[in-house]
């Protein structure tokens, strides 16, 4: 998050905070007296700005940082969600699944509403993690030479394994009867999910499943730009595994927790808890391999054929405008 602040502070937030909370001074000032704490991204920033603008909230003010983080996290999550889910829905998701008997009325609208309800609450709950990163309490670092190029690869692997293991057990525990109905059940409202359901869950559910992503950089050093890249990839991956794609038979199925695996999780509840890989499900006996006959599209096509909406091969029948 500090990497994003270093970009947005001098070009966006400095102006905004100077307008909303102007520095109480009548004399031109330079350097740190402008009210801004120095940052690596602004060392070469135009001195004319420092002469004419200033805010009573310096860049290292915890309240300013908190507000900035919430704006970045909220807008960023919404942007990634809308763009990724839209692309997945319109170009990958099989729209015939909307005829499945377990597909809810107005489901997509409900998924989107649930997602936008959850986003700001999750952002607020995760604020302490982001704030700790910005204020230097994590093990994020800037200079690659500090740990070497090989550590980029090693830390990436560790990050994915740590997250996969953590989320597996968090997810599995959420299915315990004493927890499920209070926290995780809202997400399983979508038996036949669309990409819009990726973050359509109880805010506490979204928060606890995100904890491993945040905790990792407090336990293990990671280059901050790599961390931000992987963090964004995680959000996109979460959307992709909700695309309902039941492509089966690929050798990678043995290792990757694919959309097919997660589709089965939504349908059968007690299998495929992993996030990226299948190793945890295999080891702890909760793996269910995707099989062509388990594809929910078969039931959806059957319903469509009964209603005269699909031909014998399952292809949608285009109705004329006169009908």
Swiss-Prot record:
One of its GO terms (molecular function) is iron ion binding. GO terms for cellular component: endoplasmic reticulum membrane. A motif (Histidine box-2) lies at residues 184-188. It catalyses: episterol + 2 Fe(II)-[cytochrome b5] + O2 + 2 H(+) = 5-dehydroepisterol + 2 Fe(III)-[cytochrome b5] + 2 H2O. It is found in: Endoplasmic reticulum membrane. Its main location: endoplasmic reticulum. It is an enzyme of class 1 (oxidoreductase). The keyword Lipid metabolism applies. It comes from the Eukaryota. Disruption phenotype: Leads to a severe decrease in ergosterol production and virulence when ERG3A is also deleted. Results in increased production of deoxynivalenol (DON). Pathway: Steroid metabolism; ergosterol biosynthesis. It is a multi-pass membrane protein. The keyword Oxidoreductase applies. InterPro entries: Fatty_acid_hydroxylase (IPR006694), Sterol_Desaturase_Related (IPR050307). The chain crosses the membrane at residues 67-87, 112-132, 150-170. Coiled coil: none annotated. The histidine box domains may contain the active site and/or be involved in metal ion binding. Belongs to the sterol desaturase family. In Fusarium, the biosynthesis pathway of the sterol precursors leading to the prevalent sterol ergosterol differs from yeast. The ringsystem of lanosterol in S.cerevisiae is firstly demethylised in three enzymatic steps leading to the intermediate zymosterol and secondly a methyl group is added to zymosterol by the sterol 24-C-methyltransferase to form fecosterol. In Fusarium, lanosterol is firstly transmethylated by the sterol 24-C-methyltransferase leading to the intermediate eburicol and secondly demethylated in three steps to form fecosterol. This is Delta(7)-sterol 5(6)-desaturase ERG3B.
């Amino acid at each position: 998050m500090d990497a994003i602040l270093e970009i947005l502070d001098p070009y966006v937030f400095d102006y905004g905070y100077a307008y909303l909370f102007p520095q109480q001074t009548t004399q031109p000032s330079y350097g740190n007296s402008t009210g801004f704490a120095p940052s690596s991204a602004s060392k070469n920033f135009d001195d004319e700005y420092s002469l004419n603008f200033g805010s009573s909230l310096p860049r290292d003010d915890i309240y300013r940082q908190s507000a900035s983080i919430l704006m970045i996290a909220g807008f960023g999550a919404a942007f990634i969600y809308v763009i990724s889910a839209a692309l997945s829905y319109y170009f990958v998701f099989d729209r015939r699944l909307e005829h499945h008997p377990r597909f809810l009325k107005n489901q997509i609208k409900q998924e989107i509403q649930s997602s936008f309800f959850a986003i700001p609450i999750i952002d607020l709950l995760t604020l302490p993690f982001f704030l700790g990163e910005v204020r230097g309490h994590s093990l994020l670092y800037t200079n690659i030479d500090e740990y070497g190029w090989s550590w980029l690869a090693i830390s990436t692997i560790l990050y994915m394994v740590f997250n996969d293991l953590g989320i597996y057990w968090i997810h599995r525990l959420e299915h315990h009867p004493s927890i499920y109905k209070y926290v995780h059940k809202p997400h399983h409202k979508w038996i036949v999910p669309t990409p819009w359901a990726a973050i359509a869950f109880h805010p506490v559910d979204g928060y606890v499943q995100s904890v491993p992503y945040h905790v990792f950089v407090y336990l293990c050093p990671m280059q901050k730009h790599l961390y931000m890249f992987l963090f964004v990839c995680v959000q996109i991956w979460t959307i992709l595994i909700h695309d309902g794609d039941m492509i089966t038979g690929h050798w990678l199925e043995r290792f990757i927790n694919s959309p097919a695996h997660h589709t089965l999780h939504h349908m059968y509840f007690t299998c495929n808890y992993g996030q990226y890989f299948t190793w945890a499900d295999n080891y702890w006996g909760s793996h269910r391999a995707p099989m062509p006959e388990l594809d929910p599209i078969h039931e959806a096509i059957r319903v469509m054929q009964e209603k005269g909406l699909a031909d014998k091969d399952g292809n949608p029948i285009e109705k004329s405008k006169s009908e």
